[in-house]
A protein has these predicted regions:
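Short glycine/proline-enriched turns and hinge-like loops at secondary-structure junctions
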Residues: 67, 132-134, 158-162
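Flexible, small-/acidic-enriched active-site or ligand-binding loops
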Residues: 135-137, 155-156, 182-214, 219-222
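N-terminal glycine-rich flavin-associated loop
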Residues: 84-105
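Short beta-strand-to-turn element immediately C-terminal to the catalytic PLP-Schiff-base lysine
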Residues: 99-102, 141, 167-170, 179-182, ...
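A short, Trp-centered hydrophobic/proline-enriched beta-strand micro-motif
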Residues: 116-126
């Protein structure tokens, strides 16, 4: 087992750069202003592309930096810290999926496009909320040299801005991945969803009647790579969200006064705040340990580390968001209080790819056998 957690020079540089970028481009006023936006911020997305962040994990032969997923973590963490709503995590997961499951031709066509700003969206979740392979309901039926798709996918973030989608489907009772281009989606097949996290632009994708060529099925079906990438990016976003939550809490506790004292001086508020800080440090340790072992290419260790990171982070962020609302008193329950934005993000992240109970249940046989 890997005994040393590393934090590379590249990660340090990316964390500093990404933190400053997100602080500048996603202050809370901008976050609020974009809650009802019907499009992504194209200017910010272009800047993200120009910084090379979409190519961090893409192999150099396809125009990327070849630094691996571990170096994506600081960027995703910074975006979580400032509640930045971009298609970044979906694009990174899509590129990771293509890198591990795509054919040579698919990689050569799409990976350079992603590096240059093309947006990929992951369409994996069924209407029952499941992404698990043996519960895939979407179908791909062969018809000569085409496949006809059917079914519905939910929680496809930034689907309206995507250039392509990675869709999980059943092909002759076997779970496969298909790449669907934006122009293959008929008008009216995307429906905006109302979700708890209003910084997200989430859509339902109707697959009925969509025809795709056989060569748009991915060569492989490495669902583990998708799950690992998703868990790592979610854990990074959660860790960043914890930072944002505790900053919101501490700022208010040092400002609001009651009985001629700042309320942060009262023990009943100090102790939960300290717990959140300890949870943050533990979450960050879990996160960067998971990034380290994933880079070591040890699937067994990586699964343990990633599930531990997601389980701990999910519970910690939900608690921090809840306390942030509670500490603001009656104002905390109003729409004008910024604390509720962190709670909403926490609840969204908590149930994406499994909450803490789900991952602890999967960890039990691995750790106890």
């Amino acid at each position: 087992m890997s005994s040393q957690m590393t934090f590379s020079d590249e990660q340090t540089m990316l964390l500093d750069t990404a933190t400053e970028f997100c602080r500048k481009h996603s202050p809370i006023e901008t976050v609020r202003a974009r809650l009802d936006a019907d499009q992504i911020d194209a200017t910010t997305w272009k800047e993200i592309t120009d910084l090379g962040w979409l190519g961090i994990n893409v192999p150099e032969e396809f125009g990327g930096l070849g630094l691996g997923l571990s170096c994506v973590v600081p960027v995703a963490e910074s975006m979580g810290r400032y509640l930045m709503g971009t298609p970044y995590n979906g694009a990174i997961t899509a590129s990771e999926c293509l890198a591990t499951s795509g054919s040579r031709e698919q990689k050569e066509e799409w990976l350079p496009k992603i590096v240059s700003g093309a947006i990929g969206a992951m369409a994996l979740i069924e209407t029952n909320g499941s992404w698990i392979l043996d519960q895939i309901e979407a179908q791909a039926i062969a018809s000569e040299d085409m496949f006809e798709l059917s079914g519905t996918k939910c929680f496809v973030t930034d689907a309206d801005a995507a250039d392509f989608y990675i869709v999980s489907v059943n092909v002759e009772a076997k779970a496969r991945l298909a790449l669907v281009k934006r122009e293959q989606i008929p008008e009216g097949n995307l429906h905006r969803e109302i979700v708890i996290d209003e910084t997200r632009r989430s859509y339902q994708l109707d697959l009925d009647g969509i025809m795709v060529p056989v060569d748009q099925l991915l060569e492989g079906s490495d669902f583990q790579a998708i799950e690992f990438a998703s868990l790592l990016l979610l854990s990074a976003e959660i860790t960043g969200g914890l930072v944002g939550s505790i900053h919101t809490i501490v700022e208010y506790l040092n400002t609001r006064r009651a009985f001629d004292k700042v309320i942060g001086s009262y023990q009943a508020l100090k102790h939960p705040t300290v717990k959140i800080l300890l949870d943050l440090e533990a979450s960050r340790s879990h996160l960067y340990h998971a990034a380290t072992v994933l880079a070591d290419d040890n699937a067994g260790e990586a699964e343990i580390a990633l599930r531990m990171a997601k389980a701990h982070g999910s519970a910690a962020f939900a608690f921090a968001g809840d306390r942030a609302v509670q500490f603001h008193g009656g104002f905390g329950f109003t729409y004008d209080c910024d604390a509720q934005l962190y709670l909403r993000r926490a609840l969204w992240c908590q149930y994406q790819f499994g909450d803490e109970a789900y991952h602890r249940q999967l960890l039990e046989p691995i750790l106890l056998d």
